[in-house]
Amino acid sequence: MKKIKVCLVDDNRELIGLLEDYISEQEDMEVIGVAYNGQECLSILKDKNPDVLVLDIIMPHLDGLAVLGQLKEMKKENYPNVIMLTAFGQEDVTKKAVDLGAAYFILKPFDMENLVNHIRQVSGQTSSFMQRSSSSMRSHRDSKPANLDASITSIIHEIGVPAHIKGYLYLREAISMVYKDIELLGSITKVLYPDIAKKYNTTASRVERAIR
């Protein structure tokens, strides 16, 4: 069986280590390179041809968008399928990344099983592996919301958002909603903020100001 070749790029070394271990455990995948900034990523891509590039947007030296721009200029014969990782969704950034060739967006924090399934999808592999694990996925489905809430709380604390401000509640809700429906990243001001505003009986503009 031909394995999906994956390259991982993120300045969070701990996350890269976890992803590398998890992906390497998949029967149909192999990690052929890891990088911690945009320059290292481009160096790897000069010599290697991953099927899927998992790329963080915010990184030192060169960010994810700059990497996409330079990757396009390289005119590689085998252009990788790019999955972007992002902590915050902004419509202008999302649109620019798509224009530069990004195939999919995943909002941090994310479920690793969800990521590997998307790696299979963008690489065009069959869904047999997804079907094989469907029963185990169903058995864990009830526990996911609690794990998701814990992950969201952890990441918000890490970026230093105080729990007592309103933006904290709105941000938690936004992350949870986008986790369940990634397409909301393309309609942040038109759908996401208004939906949060309805839930908290406020206006979309106030939600946006509080989050920013």
Swiss-Prot record:
A Pfam family this chain is assigned to: Response_reg
InterPro entries: CheY-like_superfamily, Sig_transdc_resp-reg_C-effctor, Sig_transdc_resp-reg_receiver, Spo0A_C, Spore_0_A, ST_Response_Regulator, WH-like_DNA-bd_sf
PTM note: Phosphorylated by KinA and KinB.
Domain Response regulatory: 5-123
GO BP terms in the entry: detection of stimulus; phosphorelay signal transduction system; regulation of sporulation resulting in formation of a cellular spore; sporulation resulting in formation of a cellular spore
Residues in the DNA-binding region annotation: 194-212
Keyword field: Activator, Calcium, Cytoplasm, DNA-binding, Metal-binding, Phosphoprotein, Repressor, Sporulation, Transcription, Transcription regulation, Two-component regulatory system
GO MF annotation: an example: DNA binding
Subcellular location: Cytoplasm
Record's keyword annotation contains Transmembrane: no
PANTHER family on file: STAGE 0 SPORULATION PROTEIN A, TWO-COMPONENT RESPONSE REGULATOR
Family annotation (NCBIfam families): spore_0_A
Main function: May play the central regulatory role in sporulation. It may be an element of the effector pathway responsible for the activation of sporulation genes in response to nutritional stress. Spo0A may act in concert with Spo0H (a sigma factor) to control the expression of some genes that are critical to the sporulation process. Repressor of abrB, activator of the spoIIa operon. Binds the DNA sequence 5'-TGNCGAA-3' (0A box).
Protein name, entry field: Stage 0 sporulation protein A
Originating gene: spo0A
